[in-house]
């Protein structure tokens, strides 16, 4: 039961933070492109690289901490399902180039962010 609570707690915090990042991006960049979703996915991928290195390898942290931070917090913060909907919406609006750029940027930058997060933490070892 405590494990489910930790996932829920982390998810709640991550979801609220995702909401605020989305609102910030909307105010800053406008509604024409899903900047908020792109930002949380890239940042979330970097953070999961950092957490994976710290929690799993460096500190051999408890399963509870992994559930709170990775499954809960990052599960609530990152938004792959929202990414998919945003991409389809761009295509449905006839913005195929923007849709393609969005998909390529999301996948490419997210993969680069995970690699960067791992590399940063490994360099600090």
From Swiss-Prot:
Its main location: membrane. The chain crosses the membrane at residues 1-21, 32-52, 68-88, 101-121. It is found in: Cell inner membrane. Na(+) is not transported, but it plays an essential structural role and its presence is essential for fluoride channel function. One of its GO terms (biological process) is cellular detoxification of fluoride. GO terms for molecular function: fluoride channel activity; metal ion binding. It holds the Pfam family CRCB. It is a multi-pass membrane protein. Keywords: Cell inner membrane, Cell membrane, Ion channel, Ion transport, Membrane, Metal-binding, Sodium, Transmembrane, Transmembrane helix, Transport. GO terms for cellular component: plasma membrane. Coiled coil: none annotated. Fluoride-specific ion channel. Important for reducing fluoride concentration in the cell, thus reducing its toxicity. NCBIfam families: crcB, PRK14195.1. Belongs to the fluoride channel Fluc/FEX (TC 1.A.43) family. This is Fluoride-specific ion channel FluC. It comes from Rhizobium etli (strain CIAT 652). The gene is fluC.
């Amino acid at each position: 039961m405590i494990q489910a609570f930790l996932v829920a707690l982390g998810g709640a915090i991550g979801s609220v933070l995702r909401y605020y990042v989305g609102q910030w991006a909307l105010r800053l960049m406008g509604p024409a492109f899903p900047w908020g979703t792109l930002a949380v996915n890239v940042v979330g991928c970097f953070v999961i690289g950092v957490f994976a290195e710290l929690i799993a390898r460096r500190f051999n942290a408890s399963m509870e901490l992994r559930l709170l931070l990775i499954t809960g917090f990052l599960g609530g913060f990152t938004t792959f399902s929202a990414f998919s909907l945003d991409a389809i919406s761009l295509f449905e609006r006839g913005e195929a180039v923007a849709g393609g750029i969005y998909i390529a940027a999301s996948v490419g930058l997210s993969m680069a962010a995970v690699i960067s997060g791992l590399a940063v933490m490994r360099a600090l070892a």
